[in-house]
């Protein structure tokens, strides 16, 4: 069909009511007898560590118009959506990277196989989020920073990471291009601190500026190696702990450092890496994060990425409390280690996976990806932490790798839930805990765990159909099915808007939730790509308006859908050069890239092809 350039004058709501938002319209009819794939993991011991069945595919079952009754019922409703999934994984600590690479424990072929099993989405479990220490941590062979020489950054170098951490991170990114990479510091260089030690101590105020540049140099050095850093936190676990690399802060200091040192350094270097605050437990929120979220200069800055949580203390429901107060603040679970102190590791992991994501987390990240048979090497701190794999080094099984229960529990998420998926509604059930997701391609994944001591029959209802399954005790399950995505063709008066590579402007996962990312995606005629241009200057889909997040005109600000409110952030003007403009900036495909899932943002108008848009006549 012919296309024409269009002209419009278009405005964005800033904050929404908390809670669940429902996509308008009923789902399309589903295919009868939809096949459901089933994957199970079972342990046999009281500690939940002896894997007798690890992510084993079972005989598929099928949806039917009716199915037998069951003791437990789970209703899956893909028309109610929550947060977007960004990834799951662990950390390339110095310990993990050295064991897997230069320790000599693994042959090259074994290392290649291990990396594929960890990061390959098809031949492995598709880990999609890693959080690496920015310098030394407790799971390292020794203390180090990237510049150990006072009193400037002329000696800055990432040579330490070039040996093991960076090559493996680069390989992981090649195996899974959707991989998100986060960096967290345990300590500033010792010479910047009042005690001249990596362990504890305070950052001296005269070095705030240099420490901000230290972050920037790290990000630039990794970028130069082809490894972009998506997120940083200011400090891992503020004020914790003695005996290994760590650093003291107070909230006012962190607040000042972010606004006066870190972000100016990022802007001077042209860095768009997002900053996550807290990176600590739920019970630390009031002390470390609440004042930062209350600061609109931080919360509304394009360099702010959200809040990072650890799961070692407090109540996970704190995350929902915070979400309800700040619905536009993204939440990430960035560390919860496995360990020998945990009574049942499988139960712990499945509770974490389900509870964290039901409380708005966009990630689930364990601690060290690997440790050896002695839970090390370690640099003080945790000598009982476990990983997704155990690398035997120097013992009778040297060179062998054990895939722990944590590998399989993580795989129940990352192998089947792709970055860009949205959590969808499913019935909470204490006997069979569960969480459900809808992938960008419309497929579904229901993750469940039988918490009881006996087999449970479970009836799953979806789209007017159901299936019944007997789930054994001590068993994790992921059920997947293709499904027919909700919605249909373009609504009355709706038009497709196309951009770079002929891809369509698309609402991710067809979700009408406030804050849903707008992206490029292969044109498919769905309601998520059906846009109505209003005489009032708005562009609408799924009953919401195309919106610039927080009405910020900063380069890199997210473009989303939001309740229509008549503000300037939803007022778009189309120009004869093919650009769409709001707040003085152009609608822009990041990258520039035409890959499915490429997020849209606003940026200075450059005349580039990633800022040209057409609407179907």
Model-identified regions with their sequence ranges:
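Secretory targeting and sorting signals
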Residues: 1-31
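N-terminal low-complexity, Pro/Thr-rich disordered segments
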Residues: 11, 24-32, 482-492, 617
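Substrate-binding and catalytic surfaces of secreted/luminal carbohydrate-active proteins
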Residues: 32-76, 181-183, 213-221, 225-231, ...
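N-terminal catalytic cores of secreted or lumenal carbohydrate-active enzymes
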Residues: 49-229, 250
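Residue-level detector of short, conserved catalytic/binding motifs and their immediate flanks
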Residues: 72, 86-88, 125-132, 179, ...
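Short beta-strand/loop motifs in extracellular/secreted proteins, especially
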Residues: 420, 432, 444, 454-458, ...
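Extracellular glycan-recognition/adhesion modules and their associated mucin-like linkers
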Residues: 488-512, 527-554, 568-594, 612-617
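Aromatic-rich beta-strand patches that line glycan-recognition/binding surfaces
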Residues: 516-522, 557-563, 598-604
């Amino acid at each position: 069909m012919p296309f024409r350039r269009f002209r419009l004058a278009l405005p964005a709501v800033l904050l929404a009511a908390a809670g669940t938002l429902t996509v308008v319209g009923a789902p399309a009819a589903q295919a009868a007898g939809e096949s459901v794939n089933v994957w199970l993991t079972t342990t046999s011991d009281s500690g939940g560590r002896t894997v007798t069945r690890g992510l084993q595919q079972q005989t598929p079952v099928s949806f039917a118009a009716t199915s037998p009754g069951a003791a437990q019922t789970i209703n899956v409703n893909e028309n109610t959506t929550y947060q977007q999934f960004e990834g799951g994984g662990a950390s390339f600590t110095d310990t993990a990277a050295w064991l897997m690479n230069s320790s000599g424990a693994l042959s090259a072929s074994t290392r290649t196989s291990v990396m594929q099993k960890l990061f390959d989405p098809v031949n492995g479990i598709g880990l999609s989020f890693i959080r690496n220490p920015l310098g030394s941590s407790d799971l390292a062979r020794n203390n180090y920073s990237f510049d150990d020489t006072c009193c400037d950054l002329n000696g800055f170098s990432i040579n330490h990471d070039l040996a093991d951490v960076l090559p493996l991170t680069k390989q992981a990114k090649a195996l899974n291009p959707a991989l998100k990479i986060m960096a967290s510091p345990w300590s500033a260089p010792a010479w910047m601190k009042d005690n001249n030690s990596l362990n504890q101590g305070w950052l001296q105020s005269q070095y705030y500026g240099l420490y901000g540049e230290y972050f920037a140099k790290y990000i630039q050095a990794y970028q130069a190696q082809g490894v972009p850093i998506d997120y940083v936190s200011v400090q891992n676990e503020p004020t914790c702990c003695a005996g290994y690399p760590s650093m003291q802060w107070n909230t006012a200091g962190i607040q000042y450092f972010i606004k006066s040192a870190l972000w100016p350094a990022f802007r001077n270097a042209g860095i768009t890496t997002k900053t996550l605050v807290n990176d600590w437990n739920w019970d630390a929120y009031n002390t470390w994060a609440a004042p930062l979220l209350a600061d609109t200069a931080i919360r509304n800055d394009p360099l702010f990425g959200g809040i990072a949580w650890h799961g070692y203390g407090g109540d996970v429901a704190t995350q929902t409390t915070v979400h309800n107060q700040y619905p536009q603040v993204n939440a990430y679970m960035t560390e919860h280690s496995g360990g020998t102190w945990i009574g049942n590791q499988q139960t712990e992991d499945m509770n974490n996976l389900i509870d964290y994501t039901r409380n708005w987390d966009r990630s689930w990240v364990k601690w060290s990806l690997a440790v050896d048979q002695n839970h090390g090497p370690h640099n003080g701190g945790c000598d009982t932490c476990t990983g997704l794999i155990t690398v035997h080094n120097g013992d009778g099984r040297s060179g062998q790798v054990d895939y722990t229960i944590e590998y399989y529990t993580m795989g129940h998420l990352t192998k089947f839930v792709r970055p860009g998926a949205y959590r969808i509604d499913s019935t909470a059930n204490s006997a069979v805990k569960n969480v459900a997701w809808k992938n960008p391609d419309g497929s579904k994944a229901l993750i469940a765990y039988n918490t009881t001591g006996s087999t449970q029959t479970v009836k799953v209802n979806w789209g007017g159909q159901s299936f019944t399954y007997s789930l054994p005790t001590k068993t994790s399950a992921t059920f997947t099915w293709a499904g027919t995505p909700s919605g249909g063709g373009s609504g009355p008066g709706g038009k497709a808007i196309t951009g770079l590579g002929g891809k369509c402007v698309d609402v991710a996962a067809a979700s009408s939730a406030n804050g849903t990312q707008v992206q490029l995606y292969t044109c498919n005629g769905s309601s998520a790509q059906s846009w109505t241009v209003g005489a009032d200057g708005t562009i609408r889909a799924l009953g919401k308006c195309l919106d610039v997040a927080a009405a910020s005109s900063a380069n890199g600000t997210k473009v989303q859908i939001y309740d229509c409110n008549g503000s300037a952030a939803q007022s778009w003007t189309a120009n004869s050069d093919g650009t769409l403009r709001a707040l003085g900036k152009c609608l822009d495909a990041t990258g520039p890239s035409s890959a499915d899932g490429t997020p849209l943002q606003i940026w200075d108008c450059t005349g580039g092809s990633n800022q040209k848009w057409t609407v179907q006549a």
